[in-house]
């Protein structure tokens, strides 16, 4: 079962989505829970990591850990100059956001089947794992180990998610869709990055739950995600029986 969820229609509320994902308010906090937190911390007000109505300030030198990758060996020993190569080249050429774009393309689930796999192989050969970017004849080098990675996936330009439950119902797989653009060459592409784990889905659902409750209205997206949540692996009710496992 595969579900595509796109947040293009949420552009007008994107600031709230950014903020909610980053601080404790995205969780579905009941009044009793908030009261307990205040009693525990002896605080009169909740202290948020970020203002609820403001998005984080994007920084080009901070990269989502979603784009972190381990260089792998590619079997390609040559690069074919074809349409795919040229499209990717134009996407990178003089791109103001070249580093993020390059890492996104390498991490793309399709990169192992094209010339970017060769590029990844070449990177593995460098002893210091150096990345180079060039724009307007000005080149910069980056040490891969010294790049600033953050757990926040929304520092990248995410436009959608794909959720997939396999037939065996023991794994949860999802893909995160990132929109890449180069205004210099007027080229665009959507890359698909595989993500294993249910944490992003939970955070996303809790974010929408809060938004729905805060503004006191429901919408089809959250209804579909709630239905989807019910059939996810390990979401059945806990048993009251003690079962021996040996």
UniProtKB/Swiss-Prot annotation:
One cellular component term from this protein's GO annotations in UniProt: membrane
Signal sequence extent: 1-19
BP GO terms, sorted: fusion of virus membrane with host plasma membrane; symbiont entry into host cell
Keywords: Disulfide bond, Fusion of virus membrane with host cell membrane, Fusion of virus membrane with host membrane, Glycoprotein, Host cell membrane, Host Golgi apparatus, Host membrane, Membrane, Signal, Viral envelope protein, Viral penetration into host cytoplasm, Virion, Virus entry into host cell
Keyword Ribosomal protein: no
Membrane topology per record: Peripheral membrane protein
Keyword Secreted tagged: no
gL betaherpesvirus-type domain ranges (all copies): 29-235
Pfam families xref list: Cytomega_gL
Disulfide topology: 134-139
Domain of life: Viruses
Principal place of residence: virion
Subcellular location: Virion membrane; Host cell membrane; Host Golgi apparatus, Host trans-Golgi network
HAMAP family for this protein: HSV_GL_betahv
UniProt record similarity statement: Belongs to the herpesviridae glycoprotein L (gL) family. Betaherpesvirinae gL subfamily.
Function: The heterodimer glycoprotein H-glycoprotein L is required for the fusion of viral and plasma membranes leading to virus entry into the host cell. Acts as a functional inhibitor of gH and maintains gH in an inhibited form. Upon binding to host integrins, gL dissociates from gH leading to activation of the viral fusion glycoproteins gB and gH.
Subunit annotation: Interacts with glycoprotein H (gH); this interaction is necessary for the correct processing and cell surface expression of gH.
Protein name, as recorded: Envelope glycoprotein L
Organism: Human herpesvirus 7 (strain JI)
């Amino acid at each position: 079962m595969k579900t595509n969820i796109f947040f293009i229609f949420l552009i007008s509320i994107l600031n709230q989505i950014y903020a909610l994902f980053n601080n404790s308010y995205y969780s579905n906090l009941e009044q009793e829970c908030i009261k307990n937190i205040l009693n525990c911390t002896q605080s009169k007000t909740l202290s948020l990591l970020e203002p609820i109505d403001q998005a984080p300030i994007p920084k080009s030198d901070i990269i989502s850990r979603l784009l972190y990758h381990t260089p792998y060996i590619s079997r390609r020993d040559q690069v074919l100059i074809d349409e795919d190569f040229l499209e990717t080249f134009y996407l990178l050429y003089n791109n103001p956001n070249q580093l993020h774009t390059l890492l996104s393309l390498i991490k793309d689930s399709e990169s192992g089947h094209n010339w970017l796999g060769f590029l990844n192989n070449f990177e593995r050969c460098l002893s210091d794992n150096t990345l180079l970017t060039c724009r307007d004849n000005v080149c910069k080098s980056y040490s891969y180990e010294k790049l600033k990675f953050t757990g926040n996936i929304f520092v990248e330009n995410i436009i959608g998610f794909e959720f997939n439950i396999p037939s065996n119902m023991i794994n949860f797989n999802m893909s995160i869709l990132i929109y890449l653009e180069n205004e210099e060459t007027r080229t665009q592409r959507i890359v698909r990055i595989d993500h294993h784990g249910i944490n992003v889905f939970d955070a996303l659902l809790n974010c929408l739950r809060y938004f729905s409750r805060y503004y006191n209205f429901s919408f089809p997206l959250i209804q579909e995600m709630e239905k989807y949540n019910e059939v996810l692996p390990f979401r059945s009710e806990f048993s009251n029986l003690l079962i021996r496992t040996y």
